[in-house]
Each structure stands twice: as C-alpha cells, then as structure tokens.
Amino acid sequence: MNFLQFFIWGSWLCTLGLYMTTPVEDGGLAFDGALVGSVFALSGIASLIMPALIGVVSDKWVNAERLMGVLHWVGAISLFCAAFVTDYDLFKIAMLVNMLAYMPTLSLSYTVAYNAIDKAGLDRIKDYPPVR
C-alpha cells in the first residue's frame, strides 16, 4: 500500500517542473521559475494544514479507508483538469486542490496500515517495518 501511495506522487512530481517550463510550442506551459516555485510551494502549504483537519474528520465522522478513497478521487480529477489548463491561475488552483487532497492521504495510509496490523493481532513495532 505504501508503494502505491508514493507511486501516485512520484508519477507526476518528477516531470511537473519540466512540463511547466517547456515552451508552449513543445507542449508545455512556458512558466518562468518563480511561477514554477510557487506551484511546488503548494505542497508544503497543504502538508501543514490538511493532515490535521482530515485527521479530525477521519477520527470523528468518516472511516479512514473511505476518506482516503474520496481524497484520491478528488486528486485524480484535479490532475486530469490540470492537464488541460494552460492559464497559470487555473493551473495553480488545480494543483492546490490536488495537494489539499493528496497530502492527508499520506497519514491516512499509515492509519489504515496500523489498523490492519492491529486487527491481525500483530505487533506494530515488530511487524510493520517488513510490511512497509
């Protein structure tokens, strides 16, 4: 599960900078360095805010598996929309929505894994590292 969780992020994060700086004639967005940096800064902002908020929602109202699924769908839709956007402001909004949806799923994946380990009657300290 952790492999797939980080595979999602790595599948687009590695090439996003190149896509944003490539000229429009070559299929890119032709953003300058400051615009590219501001898009990448969204992940830091989202990672400070959203895990705590979604953690409260997960603890009180919605189970972690469902919430994680909904957030991954929101992220997928926002990335799909970002692929068709050429305007910087709209692209930044699409990436912000993606980051706001993706960042809490990192901690939710650990919650789901720990819950599965507990249900199986295993020890988290001893049995989680090999699973990871």
Predicted regions and their residues:
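Helix-loop boundary and gating motifs at the non-cytosolic
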Residues: M1-I45
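Hydrophobic core of transmembrane alpha-helices in multi-pass small-molecule transporters
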Residues: F3, G75-S78, Y88-L106
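Short helix-kink/termination motifs in transmembrane helices of multi-pass secondary transporters
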Residues: F7-T15, N63, P104, L108
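Residue-level signal for conserved functional micro-sites within the alpha-helical transmembrane segments
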Residues: W9, S43-P51, Y102, L106
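Helix-to-loop junctions at the C-terminal end of transmembrane segments
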Residues: I49-N63
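Helix-breaking motifs and short loop linkers at transmembrane-helix boundaries and internal kinks
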Residues: V62, F84-D89
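Structural signature of the two symmetry-related core transmembrane helices
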Residues: R66-C81
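Cytoplasmic helix-loop-helix junction between adjacent transmembrane helices
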Residues: L96-V131
